[in-house]
């Protein structure tokens, strides 16, 4: 009986032994493949040691800098990091929506156009009252300038970014409207900052006014302007209304925080004239020569300076 059972035992145990052999051969093949690229392993190890070494060397300097930094500098650094992360997340979120075809490319581009300026302005009170605060805030548009130059000059590629912020999906388009936009953000921070209504009104007209003009004009702009077939009556009216309302809202926001004074009985009429000037400039058929992201804020800055002055809205 025992002798008869042996073949059965062998049959039962044979698959297990074969699976073990297969597993062993698989492990050996993996080991061979790993050993087959010692250069890659050495490079990876070198990169790890380099990163750890740089981190270890920089840690004391970072700790010393943090210990010697003033509370205002720490606050400004934290605000810069937070806003930079928010700006990157905003663009990436609409990248994803565009890639999944949940939103049209042109609509995505203009929503990013509107939100970028509005959210950036709204975040300015996060910075301290130090004289250096504006330079920390300027880091955010400066990084975006570098990013747009990098992809616009094809030094690197980011197809999702290109699709979400350009009209035709071409990298070189990043060097026009989007780049002009962030340059205006940079200039507004460095020249006007929170103490002047000029930069705030200019960004409101560029982001909100021009942005809503395109959104509404594309959908409902069948009646074109007689002197510019690329612009519509409804789009221009939308720019005037949205730019005026957003400018008034942002002036109210910053005046409530005490950055400047607004005499509302005079300011609203002057603000309407500024919005009208920006709308007229946006209607002029010179977009092939001067981009709207340059002409609109420049016209707004000039009109606001003539009507308001530098530091008040009275």
Curated annotation (Swiss-Prot):
Recorded topology in the membrane: Multi-pass membrane protein
Alphabetical keyword list: Chloroplast, Kinase, Membrane, Plastid, Transferase, Transit peptide, Transmembrane, Transmembrane helix
Interval spanned by the transit peptide: 1-62
Annotated catalysed reactions: phytol + CTP = phytyl phosphate + CDP + H(+)
Enzyme Commission no: 2.7.1.182
Gene Ontology MF: a single term: phytol kinase activity
Cellular component terms (Gene Ontology): chloroplast; chloroplast membrane
Coiled coil: none
TM regions (residue ranges): 72-91, 111-131, 135-155, 181-201, 234-254, 266-286, 294-314
Localization, UniProt: Plastid, Chloroplast membrane
UniProt pathway annotation: Cofactor biosynthesis; tocopherol biosynthesis
InterPro entries according to UniProt: Phytol/farnesol_kinase (IPR039606)
GO biological process: vitamin E biosynthetic process
Biological role stated in the UniProt entry: Involved in the activation and reutilization of phytol from chlorophyll degradation in plant metabolism, including tocopherol biosynthesis. Catalyzes the conversion of phytol to phytol monophosphate (PMP).
Family designation: Belongs to the polyprenol kinase family.
Record's protein name: Probable phytol kinase 1, chloroplastic
Organism: Oryza sativa subsp. japonica (Rice)
């Amino acid at each position: 009986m025992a002798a008869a059972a042996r073949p059965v035992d062998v049959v039962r145990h044979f698959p297990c032994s074969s699976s073990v052999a297969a597993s062993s051969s698989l492990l050996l093949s993996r080991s061979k493949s790993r050993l087959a690229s010692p250069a890659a392993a050495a490079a990876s190890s070198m990169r790890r040691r380099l990163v750890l070494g740089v981190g270890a060397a920089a840690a004391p300097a970072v700790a010393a800098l943090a210990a010697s930094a003033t509370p205002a500098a720490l606050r400004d650094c934290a605000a810069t990091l937070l806003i930079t992360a928010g700006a990157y997340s905003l663009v990436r979120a609409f990248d994803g929506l565009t890639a999944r075809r949940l939103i049209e490319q042109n609509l995505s581009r203009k929503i990013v156009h509107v939100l970028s300026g509005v959210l950036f302005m709204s975040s300015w009170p996060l910075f301290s009252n130090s004289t250096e605060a504006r330079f920390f805030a300027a880091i955010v548009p400066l990084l975006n300038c570098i990013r747009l130059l990098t992809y616009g000059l094809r030094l690197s590629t980011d197809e999702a970014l290109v699709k979400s912020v350009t009209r035709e999906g071409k990298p070189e388009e990043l060097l026009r409207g989007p780049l002009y936009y962030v340059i205006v953000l940079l200039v507004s921070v460095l020249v006007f900052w929170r103490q002047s209504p000029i930069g705030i009104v200019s960004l409101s007209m560029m982001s909100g006014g021009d942005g809503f003009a395109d959104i509404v004009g594309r959908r409902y702009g069948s009646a074109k302007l007689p002197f510019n077939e690329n612009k519509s009556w409804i789009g221009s009216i939308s720019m005037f209304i949205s730019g005026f309302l957003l400018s008034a809202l942002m002036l109210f926001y910053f005046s409530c925080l005490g950055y400047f004074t607004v005499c509302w009985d005079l300011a609203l009429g002057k603000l309407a004239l500024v919005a009208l000037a920006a709308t007229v400039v946006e209607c002029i058929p010179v977009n092939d020569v001067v981009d709207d992201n340059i002409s609109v804020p420049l016209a707004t800055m000039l009109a606001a300076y003539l009507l308001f002055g530098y530091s008040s809205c009275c």
